[in-house]
Design a protein with these regions (language model features):
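Cytosolic regulatory/linker segments at or just downstream of nucleotide-handling modules
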Residues: 348-350
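Acidic, carboxylate-rich catalytic segments that either coordinate divalent cations
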Residues: 373
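Short, charged low-complexity linker/loop segments at the C-terminal edge of domains
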Residues: 104-105, 343-345
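ATP-dependent adenylate-handling active sites, centered on carboxylate activation for C-N bond formation
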Residues: 114-344, 356-368
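Cysteine-centered catalytic environments shared across enzyme families
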Residues: 1-199, 203-204
Length: 373
């Protein structure tokens, strides 16, 4: 997707990169706000250009506007803009930006506005929304799930098994000690749905070109190497899309009952009775993760989906009571897997590779992680 003042269409057109699941015939801001998908897009009208990112910036939109020379460029690939000797600015998550083609002034507004009422006492709507989000995104002819021992990929795998799928997952061997998996849980999962294992050899991959696409500090060596290896393997089986649990930090804040387990924890996972105390949520960690995956998959000619930040699912979870949210670590994920008897380790944080109930281990874990990254 590349839209510039030079190739601007003569007719009203909506261009997008990624996936839209509820119709892509978009002609207005109101219709943009109704979109559900993993996408970024540009609506070209006679008098303005309207650009949009989804609520968690599942796809990154880069742009550059020069009001003096009345030029503009929008693209999902930063290299398009770099080749013009321009800097690729990134549009924030959950944002609609309008460029007036008469005045060349820009205005911004939020895409999704969350309903912060916490009224639901069960996870019924959350589970229904999770099933729908995963089902609408899953394409067995193109997709593979990035499998770990954590809660996030576990929920997706559990749902896919309930839908009757097998042989849908892939995982990589060769993790650094600070990112070690809980091997017993992972082995059970791979055995249940016949997951594939690849050996990741970092010597075979160079993430420098990806970093040069756009400086993204979360493209660490191991994660970048893993994604690159999976993309290469996908091509050998005629597939081209990775499905991940990225974004599920939103549901736990890397904390529990007010204890912060990571420096990017906002409120220690202690959800208040009034969500206005913690909203707007700090989503930098989510954006970094999705951004890292997007750059790697884009570079390798593949794609990436994040069903756990589907806006309908997120909204359903927001509407659950604060007591449910505070019932345990990533409690809706826990409850979903427990209901379907899917393997998981209770209170296990894949990102910290340990049991969140053992608070004395976290100082050491955090030190190791900081030293690694």
């Amino acid at each position: 997707m590349l839209v510039t003042d030079k190739n601007y269409p003569s007719e009203e057109t909506f261009f997008y990169y990624g996936y839209i699941y509820n119709g892509d015939k978009v002609t207005s801001v109101e219709e943009i706000k109704a979109i559900n998908g993993d996408y970024c897009g540009v609506l070209c009208k006679d008098d303005c250009v309207i650009a949009v990112t989804d609520p968690f910036r599942s796809k990154i939109l880069y742009y550059n506007i020069d009001p003096e020379y009345r030029t503009f460029v929008f693209s999902h690939d930063p290299r398009d803009i770099q080749h013009m000797d321009l800097y690729p600015y990134t549009l924030e998550e959950n944002t609609i930006v309008t460029l007036d083609l008469h005045t060349f002034k820009i205005t911004k507004q939020p895409n999704m506005i969350w309903d912060l009422e916490q009224r639901d006492q069960t996870y019924t709507k959350v589970f229904d929304a999770a099933n729908a989000a995963i089902k609408m995104r899953w394409n067995p002819d193109k997709d593979k799930l990035m499998m770990t021992s954590g809660y996030d990929s576990g929920v997706i795998a559990c749902c896919l098994m309930n839908m009757g799928y097998s042989k849908f997952s892939v995982t990589g061997l060769g993790t650094p000690p600070s990112m070690a998996e809980h091997q017993e849980t992972l082995a059970k999962r791979l055995a249940m749905h016949k997951g594939h294992i690849i050996k990741v050899n970092g010597n075979n991959y160079d993430i420098t070109p990806i970093i040069e696409m756009r400086n993204n500090h979360n493209v660490n060596e191991y994660y970048g190497h893993l994604l690159m290896a999976v993309c290469d393997w996908l091509k050998t089986i005629n597939k081209d899309c990775i499905v991940t649990g990225n974004g599920a930090f939103f549901y736990d804040d890397k904390g529990l009952h007010g204890r912060q387990f990571a420096h990017y924890s906002h409120f220690g996972g202690a959800y208040p009775k009034d969500l206005n105390l913690i909203f707007p949520r700090q989503t930098l960690r989510i954006i970094q993760m999705s951004g890292a995956a997007n750059l790697v998959t884009l570079y390798k000619g593949c794609d990436h989906k994040q069903p756990l930040v589907d806006p309908v699912l997120v909204q359903a979870w927001i509407n659950t009571s604060h007591k449910l949210k505070n019932s345990g670590y990533k409690h809706w994920n826990y409850a979903y897997m427990k209901e379907h008897d899917y393997p998981f380790k209770e209170n296990f944080s894949n990102g910290l590779a340990d049991d969140v109930s053992r608070i004395e281990t976290f100082a050491e874990k955090l030190k190791i992680i900081k030293e690694y990254g």
